[in-house]
A protein has these predicted regions:
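Short linear interaction motif-like sites in intrinsically disordered regions of transcription factors
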Residues: 5, 48-50, 61, 205, ...
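Catalytic cores of phosphodiester-bond-cleaving enzymes
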Residues: 2, 15, 71
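Extended acidic low-complexity intrinsically disordered regions
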Residues: 1-11, 351-352
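A short alpha-helix capping/helix-coil boundary motif
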Residues: 13-15, 114-115
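Non-heme di-metal
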Residues: 69-352
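Amphipathic alpha-helical packing elements
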Residues: 15-68
Length: 352
């Protein structure tokens, strides 16, 4: 029987003394680190652990939201232009969140060399799958043609254009032969991650829910709007974390991004977003138009650029949707008899 008072065997002592050296926190790095990826602490990046802890305060599921009124609104209150907006926003989002899930899980997470970063990213992968469930739940609840909605990204050029651009830029980080000690590969990876954090999640997602929020603000599709509010809160943490990681990599690896490549990223993403806005809002809805959507994208892009120390790509862009930030920070009080009470916290206040 094991006696805890017994001294360890001599060979065990020797094995311990001759084993790997303890992890020195100063040796940890975001990428290209050589410390033990299986040892969580000591933390080099305590902020990453805070993101993980805060994310776990934000738990929700699509089944927490009452969608009964949405069924009535969609079939009896929305006009054709509003249905066009609603369906195509969902068509874009259904594919995008799966793309986001795969990018984090297959391309980014495995390149991190500090476990506190990976642990939050594992939570992020879970949240992206939850978001995909939310879109599917909306589609099922309204009895929409799933095959038709899901295939729109293949047949609608304006939706396909955004997905194609995202695939091209994100696939670069999934190359099996990528060597982050090679300056060219490192630049390519950081540009891919910058696109993901600043554009894909930080601008396209962040701004992309706005057309449905515009319906929600008029008392339409409030259940869907509430689902998207919860998703937006998750996404706000995602892109905030991603931009923080990008900043950390730039500092640790002492690299400067290619200004031409950065400019091309902004211009290409704006062109894709403008084409998308012109399609989904070809007929403006009350209180929201394609011009409104595109201008807000430019304003949001400026904010993301400033976060990583880049010049504003679209100087003078106006904040035409000041209510958008409120959607990511609003605490919701629910009537117990209408839906399950959800105290959706953000934990600590984060700066976007």
């Amino acid at each position: 029987m094991l006696n805890w008072d017994d001294e360890p065997k001599t060979e065990s002592k020797a094995a311990t003394q001759n084993g790997p050296a303890p992890v020195n926190v100063d040796d940890k790095r975001v990428i290209n680190g050589e410390t033990d990826i299986n040892q969580l602490a000591p933390f080099k990046y305590p902020w990453a652990w805070e993101y993980f802890m805060n994310a776990n305060k934000n738990h929700w599921t699509p089944l927490d939201v009452n969608m009964a009124q949405d069924v009535h609104d969609y079939h009896h209150r929305l006009n054709p232009a509003e249905k066009h907006v609603y369906e195509n926003v969902l068509a874009y989002l259904t594919t995008s969140d799966i793309l986001a899930m795969r990018n984090i899980g297959l391309a980014v997470m495995e390149k991190m060399s500090a476990p506190e970063l990976q642990i939050y990213q594992a939570r992020q992968v879970y949240e992206e799958s939850m978001h995909t469930w939310a879109y599917q739940h909306c589609i099922e609840t309204l009895n929409l043609d799933q095959s038709e909605i899901y295939n729109r990204y293949r047949v609608v050029p304006e939706i396909h254009g955004k997905i194609r651009m995202a695939n091209r830029r994100l696939d670069a980080a999934m190359r099996p032969d990528m060597n982050l000690r090679n300056p060219d590969d490192l630049q390519e990876f950081v540009m891919s991650y910058l696109f993901f954090a600043a554009v894909f999640e930080g601008a396209w997602f962040y701004n992309g829910f706005s057309p449905i929020f515009a319906l929600q603000r008029r008392g339409l599709m409030r259940g869907t709007g509430e689902q998207l509010q919860y998703i937006l809160r998750d996404e706000a943490m995602h892109f905030s974390f991603g931009l923080k990681v990008v900043n950390q990599i730039l500092e640790e690896e002492n690299i400067t991004l290619d200004p031409k490549a950065v400019r091309e990223m902004w211009d290409e993403s704006e062109a894709a977003e403008t084409a998308y806005a012109n399609y989904i809002l070809r007929d403006p809805i009350l209180g929201y138009s394609a011009e409104y959507h595109s201008e807000q994208f430019r304003f949001v892009a400026n904010r993301r650029a400033r976060t990583v120390g880049l010049e504003e790509p679209f100087p003078g862009a106006k904040n035409v949707s000041p209510w958008l930030d409120e959607q990511a920070t609003l605490r919701k009080e629910k009537n117990f008899f209408e839906t399950r009470v959800i105290e959706y916290q953000t934990g600590a206040q984060l700066e976007w």
